[in-house]
Design a protein with these regions (language model features):
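Functionally important transmembrane alpha-helices
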Residues: 239, 260-324
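Juxtamembrane helix-loop-helix connectors linking adjacent transmembrane helices
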Residues: 141-237
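Membrane-interface helix/loop boundary segments of multi-pass membrane proteins
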Residues: 182-192, 240-265, 301-305
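Membrane-interface helix-boundary motifs at transmembrane edges
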Residues: 62-75, 116-127, 151, 180-188, ...
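Hydrophobic alpha-helical transmembrane segments
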Residues: 130, 190-198, 227-231, 260-265, ...
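Alpha-helical transmembrane segments in multi-pass membrane proteins
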Residues: 39-49, 73-173
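Alpha-helical transmembrane segments
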Residues: 8-26, 49-54, 74-87, 131-138, ...
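Juxtamembrane "helix-exit" motif on the non-cytosolic side of transmembrane helices
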Residues: 24-35, 61-64, 86-96, 118, ...
């Protein structure tokens, strides 16, 4: 039987997902994370795999498929409670189940889904969007879920939880136009992403050096380390952040404020999201991240592709990691 394009895409998505998990497992084994987790390595990897799954498979059409299958408001509101399962997968073997946390990680998706459901037919940003995005932004920015995965090496898991929930709310329930969340490789996405990276690079290096934020250092990592770093940056940093700040936030803001104002405001909020990185208020990082956000937003806006802005974001972060 000849496979259709959709079936081939699903097969590749599953195969690549398995490869990603193997690469991540190998990278963790070489790092100090494995030692710090001790006997909790397997539950941590399983929890990570479950939280990564929505971010990955929504990029290959899972969100649209769920939108067709979950027809009743009740089923759409109840389904995302499954996002709480990865917490139990990690906490139960560790004997560290916190019932207050369990209630939050299972109930928060249901409550926010119900709020979004009431605005699903609206094609512009409404007060429900402000409530939902504010809640998601607050949960992540204030690191409210960090104690639930209490290891430094697992800091990305709360981000994946929030990202998966945001995707579900705006792709499955809200079905908002123009999010552009697809991980299927496209030539124009790569060209748009690399173009904005080239535009930002001299400005970012010049301003970063002037502010004393970056300092040049030569670094040539092993090929395996470089590939692992690029993959990690793309999947765990660029994609979730670009999906939220560009595909959802900037997209919604455009419906009320117009393209240019939305671009600047989304970039400013993106910059402010980095205020607690390192210093108590890292104003240098906020300035540079805000300016970078302008170029990320331009990359997304060119063809409404999260992949494009994720490529720009990844390229910026990898250059910073390698040489600054």
């Amino acid at each position: 039987m000849k496979l259709t394009t959709e079936q081939t895409r699903k097969t590749w998505a599953i195969a690549l997902y398995a490869c990603i998990l193997l690469v991540m497992r190998a990278g963790i084994a070489r790092s100090g994370i494995a030692a710090s987790l001790a006997g909790q390595l397997r539950p941590a990897l399983l929890s990570f795999g479950l939280l990564l799954a929505p971010l990955w498979f929504f990029g290959f059409g899972l969100g649209e498929w769920l939108g067709r299958k979950l027809r009743s408001p009740w089923s759409r509101a109840a389904f995302p409670a499954l996002l709480g399962v990865p917490y139990l997968v990690f906490a139960i073997p560790a004997g560290n189940v916190r019932w207050s946390t369990t209630v939050v990680v299972f109930l928060l998706p249901v409550v926010l889904s119900a709020v979004v459901e009431s605005s699903a037919s609206k094609r512009k940003m409404v007060w429900q969007d402000v409530v939902v995005l504010g809640a998601l932004f607050g949960v992540y920015l204030l690191r409210l879920l960090m104690p639930d995965w209490p290891h430094a090496g697992l800091a990305v898991l709360p981000k994946l939880y929030v990202a998966g929930l945001a995707l579900y709310l705006y792709v499955v329930i809200r079905k908002f136009d123009g999010v552009g969340y697809s991980l299927v490789p496209k030539r124009d996405a790569f060209l748009s992403g690399l173009r904005e990276w080239v535009y930002f690079l001299p400005l970012g290096i010049g301003l970063g050096a002037a502010l004393g934020f970056i300092h040049f250092h030569a670094s040539v990592p092993f090929t395996a380390s470089l590939l692992s770093g690029v993959l990690t940056t793309f999947l765990l940093v660029a994609v979730p952040e670009e999906m939220f700040f560009r595909g959802i936030l900037q997209n919604l803001l455009e419906t009320r404020l117009g393209q240019n104002t939305a671009l600047v405001l989304a970039a400013l909020l993106f910059g402010l999201a980095h205020f607690n990185t390192g210093a108590s208020f890292n104003w240098r990082y906020v300035i540079l991240a805000t300016i970078a956000g302008i170029f990320y937003g331009r990359a997304w806006r060119a063809r409404r592709q999260v992949l494009a802005s994720s490529i720009t974001h990844t390229a910026v972060d990898v250059v910073w990691w390698l040489w600054f």
